[in-house]
Every structure is written in C-alpha cells, then in structure tokens.
C-alpha cells in the first residue's frame, strides 16, 4: 500500500502536500494498511509518512455528505419518503453565489432525491439542508439570518460519525482536526461546512466514518495491534496471550431506511447512469464498490488548489473492507488521482489480504 502511495505522489507537482490512505475492517476496526507520503511543496522532496494519516488535518470536501443527510433525516427536515429538493445556485446577501459543480449558473436546475444528491454530489442540496436545520427560509438574495448555533449542530452530527474528533487509534500523536471560525461574521461558512469545504479532518477519521456507513451505525475504534503472542521454544510464535477485540465507542441508532438512502446513493456514485455521477471511473473495480468522492476548493500561498478525497467500501452489498484516500492541494489536472489510487489499493487487497472468490458476483 505504501508503494501505491509512493507511486501516486511521485507524479504530483505544484503545491501538492502528498497523499494518505487507510484500509480498515469496518466490523472490527483492524487496520489492514495505513500509508502516506509527505511532499514538501517548496522543494518537491517526498518523505514516507504513514503517521500523516492521523496527524495531518485536511479539508476533505464532499465525502461528508452522507453524514449530512443522516443528520437531516434525524432532525426531521427531510424524511425517507419526502426528500426531494431542487438543485439551484444559492445566493445570499453579501456572499458570492454558491452552487453545485454541475450547476454554477442555474442552467441545470434539477429535482434531486437525497440518494441522487449523493450520486451527483450536490452542494446546493446540502446547503439547503443546513438552512432548513437552522430554521432559515431561503429566498434568492436574502440576508442569511441563521443563528451561529448551526455550526455546533452540524459539527455535533459530524462528530458522531468520527469527523472532527480523535478516533482513539493505538498510536500517539493523533489530532482531532481543525474547525473554522463560528461567529456571526462567518455565518455564510456554515453553508460551506455542510458540504465539506470548511473544517478539516484526518484520513483515519475518514476510515472510521466510512466504516460507520458500511456497518450501519457502529463507531469502532481503529487499531493496528491485532494480538500479542508468547515466544515459542523453537523460535516461532507461541500461543496468543492477548487479542484485540472490537471496541464500539458509539452507535448511530437510526432506521434501516436511512442507511438505505446512503447505501443507494454511494452505489450510484460509482454505478449510476447520470452524466453527473462523480465516481463512474471506478465502476470496473471488482468486486463492486460503493463510494463517495470529495473535492474541496483550497488555497495555498494565495494560489487556488483542490483537495481530492474518497471514501469507499467493498463489496458494496456485503462490506468486508473500507478504503479511504486524501490528496491535499492539487492542481486541477489531477482530478482522478483519488479514484485511480482506490483502484490500485483494492486490487492489492483482493490479491494479498483476502481472496475475492465468492465476491465476484453481486446479490
């Protein structure tokens, strides 16, 4: 896995900081692989940096959207049977127009279910959810009068999914991420928070979060240690003296109908027929995966960059493994590195860790 990340980062230039990846068992928290490369954007020099997966805070982008939808369902602003909103550019007073990547000007306004909003990665849908959760009735050009408590409400929901809080991994140096400012002056940034373009998280947090999505609600502590064995008399490993057991640190207890929306949407990200489905470059991965891609608009030294990420699990209908990746501060011409890297990691997983026999066909 480290070789895969080395190869991926080797082709990067500009202000790229490198990249990070984690593969994890969504049912036990056991880490199959954790890899990373730090790239000095000033010199281009790279350093092997797997610990960056737990101590580098990155603005991850749209990968947060499944959590945003679950939060909105829990709040009751949408329901499993009533969740259609129109994707349209959002304009509030004294703030530039914010919109979805495929509908910046309003020429592609379209009604979306929550599941389809994931498929096409609708920023507009998430902003509308945030405004609904804040009790703000939106109209074009209106003054955004949301209370600052919306920051806490959105963050509390993300925290339940492991975003913005330490996972408790059995390594020193883990950080919780970074929060943007939350005063009334920055209330417009609550809209950015709703689609992942404000706060920063770590790659290990993405792994725990994606595991929660895969296992339908169980927040499990990630761990590298699997077991401790005694020394055998012949120099070989002896009996198991201690074995790490899954440590469930929280449960998101919601109806299966909520998870069905998320799983359907993440499947359609990869296998959907919409021209705007964001992950179809991964449709040939076998066994089939479900995923959510992420793109954050970032800035480095006054230069616009993008940060690409992805969360995924496979097989989509019986998750055995979660794979997540993050590549901060890229030039826009590297727009598929997140998906290409996922492909390579899955190929290695099914070859070296677990046989894909029995998972070749979908249910």
Listing of model-derived features with the role each one plays in the protein:
Residues 328-341:
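A short acidic/glycine-rich loop-to-helix N-cap element
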Residues 9, 19-56, 70-327, 363:
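Beta-lactam-recognizing serine transpeptidase/beta-lactamase-like catalytic domain environment
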Residues 235, 240, 247, 339-363:
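Short, gly/Ser/Thr-rich active-site loops of penicillin-recognizing serine hydrolases
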Residues 1-12, 362-363:
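N-terminal leader/targeting segments and the immediately adjacent pre-domain N-terminus
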Residues 14-16:
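Feature responds to low-complexity, polar/acidic, surface-exposed segments characteristic
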